[in-house]
Swiss-Prot record:
Leading EC class: transferase
MF terms (GO), sorted A to Z: ATP binding; magnesium ion binding; methionine adenosyltransferase activity
Protein name: S-adenosylmethionine synthase
Single biological process term from Gene Ontology: one-carbon metabolic process
Ligand binding (Mg(2+)): D17
Known pathway: Amino-acid biosynthesis; S-adenosyl-L-methionine biosynthesis; S-adenosyl-L-methionine from L-methionine: step 1/1
Family: Belongs to the AdoMet synthase family.
Swiss-Prot/TrEMBL keywords: ATP-binding, Cytoplasm, Magnesium, Metal-binding, Nucleotide-binding, One-carbon metabolism, Potassium, Transferase
EC code(s) of this entry: 2.5.1.6
Compartment(s): Cytoplasm
Cofactor: Mg(2+); K(+)
Subunit structure, interactors included: Homotetramer; dimer of dimers.
Cofactor comment text: Binds 2 divalent ions per subunit.
Amino acid sequence: MPTRLFTSESVTEGHPDKIADAISDAVLDAMLTEDSHSHAAVETVVTTGQVMVCGEVTTEAYVDIADIARSRILDIGYDSSSKGFDGASCGVSVAIDAQSPDIAQGVTAAYETRHGSTDLIDSQGAGDQGLMFGYACTETPSLMPLPIDMAHALSLQLTKVRKEGALDYLCPDGKTQVTIRYNEDDKPVAVDTVIVSSQHRAGIDLDATMTPDLRRLVIDPVLERYDLDHKDMRVLVNPTGKFVIGGPMGDAGLTGRKIIVDTYGGMARHGGGAFSGKDPSKVDRSGAYAMRWVAKNVVAAGLADRCECQVAYAIGAARPVGFRIDTFGTNHVPETVIERAVGEVFDLRPGAIIADLDLLRPIYSQLVAGGHFGRELPGVTWELTDRAEALAATARL
């Protein structure tokens, strides 16, 4: 029987790029806590002993960015130079400017308003041009692709084991990767390969200690959650042989460099825009969240088994310049019917998305590690299937 393989990866909160994401979103959340209408584009770079936070903001809030950065680093677990980073002693530099007034005028007085529209939702334009994708499928209960779902489960379990102290030699940096075998009907049938790489203290025996420990406490508990054959699975733990130097000492980290990890693990297309550090007026974030909401409701409504949605915006304009759906031949009604139903049930103007999903809240830090989609977390409204019934009814009129 012909089969194919598909692979997705995840990273832990201690990965350098995720440290940067965590700081950017912690600063954003702090601003939204004091001023829910803050506009922010916060970028972070971390390297050996150093953090730099830069970007543009418009806010009435006062936040101590250096203190937030240090606190977030310590929360992740970098509290000693022996781990490659220490939030208490690292240098933190801040270079934050005001948002460009040229951009701001397009967000607060959109193209439609300037051309006569009196609709309040038309007054908020997109914070940038761009295209965003959303995806859902029936491979998992969360309607996420199986490879990324399992990869995230492994990375979150690895962090849990470390933070609970079950394996006191583990350090914060880590990565996971899962390869799934699909049959000729494009259904997942087996786990082919699992890779777990974790930073650790020096002197730990990989074969005698670390591999069996991670198999017992990380890999096996995660595999038990999935009804999938794994008897012939290959397991690779720290395949370089050791992983002592990690975190920003091993690699510099930048905000927005794990966009595939943050979304669908490569199973769906990506418009290129990152999430962390951006308030929801940035459609890179709010548009992508809305597309997941739409795609998940299409699948939950039984209109398709797989659904990828694309939306596109012009900077300063409220109404999307493009929208399309691809169901990869799994649709149960014509795709044109699904697109029409989505247009009737969902309002994809930025102001409507922000209001409908209640995005002006400090909810973003919790999403930094483990993905922005498929999560059952407080305030993650884009995972609701609250419009599936309306979609189904509209599509079948």
